[in-house]
Amino acid sequence: MSFCEARFFEEKSSNIVVENGVAKTLGSGIISGIGIRVIVDKRWGFASTNATTPAEVDRASSDAIGGARSIAAEGVEEAVVVNQKLATDSVVHRAKMNPDDVDPEEKVRVLLELDKVARTYSDRVKDTFTTYRDAVTTAVVHNSFGTYVEEVTPRTYAYCRVISKEGSNMQTGIEYGGGVAGFEVVNRLQDEQFSRRAAEKAVKLLSARPPPTGTYTVVVDQRVGGLFMHEAFGHNCEADSVLGGQSIVADKMGEKVASDIVTIMDDPTMPKNGHFVYDHEGVKAEPHTIVRDGTLVGFLHSLESAAKMKAQPQGSARARSHQFPPIIRMSNTYLAPRDMAFEEMLGDVKRGVYLTGMNSGYVETQKGQFTCRVEQGWLIERGELQDHLRDVSINGLTLDALKNITAVGKDFKMDSPGTCGKMGQGIPTDAGAPHFRIDGIVVGGRQ
């Protein structure tokens, strides 16, 4: 056995769902257990157990070893890990309002109030859906390099979706927020009237017009921009995708992949939803520069990919729970700000489209193609925002879009907390950007 890792995981969570003024769900749960990962005969083995008794851990260890030997007999690619820096640490992220200390009835009361604010905004509001989730996770990683780290992290998230209707026209407004914090997140969102904003958006979109169709210069807000960086580009820079031949930038290290004004980072040290101090291989988290001034300079790594690509791991391997092995994941991904004001960015556009709020997206990572449906937009004419637009979608080629970024703003914001799915594992992430401008984007949508 050349490598062994034991990872304890525990998550205590609660969730609430309110629909149209009725509390539909009030749940809570605990999951816990240990995952064992080994390299035996130069092959990976993994097994997990929900029971943490010595006998069950021994059984899981035997299963992991047996699995590695079975794989070795099949001639699967050899496993290898880079020798990591030894770490011994205990980290506890403190919440101002520990979710466990807030009475469930109080949580429901606040959610009902948020839902009511949205529901009573207008008689054109026809459906409201407000959800809440908190979770406190404990991860302990101990491996044969001598690393022993523990990290306790609270996360809280709230979401409000409002559907408006006028005749046959139906529109949706969405607001959400969260991060590494406690119930204070919900109090802040309540103060910011986030559910009212969702309702206001949905109702105003009823009087918006369909978008123009064609190829345009577009200006995108922080949410559209951040999620573009995460979905369209970030997954291409996860080293397992590179090694698996599924990345459009696999052979472009050191080459220009974007405009000179583009710098893209993934930074787990930022206190946002993707924040952590140690990844689930026990590696200390560091900021990762992926693209610097338009040039591809780095990938996100695990211990294995770092060994295979002769790189240094900076803390990018995480697992959903003890039941899964760590895989390479993004954390807080963003486009770094420059110095242009929003008004100046618009001023250079004779005719284009301003896009705000991501609704949904589809990315073909291997082909480098993206399609995004945004919440709303505005027509830009001679540097001024004009007609309000609904049902807007955009599509294009990722690398072409990055190279056609002609302006990057200074108004940086990271405010897209969510859960990113990959290989059956949902992991907390965040994304951000300043406003930025792209030429040559195909705009369309429902007419």
Predicted regions and their residues:
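N-terminal small-residue-enriched
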Residues: 1-447
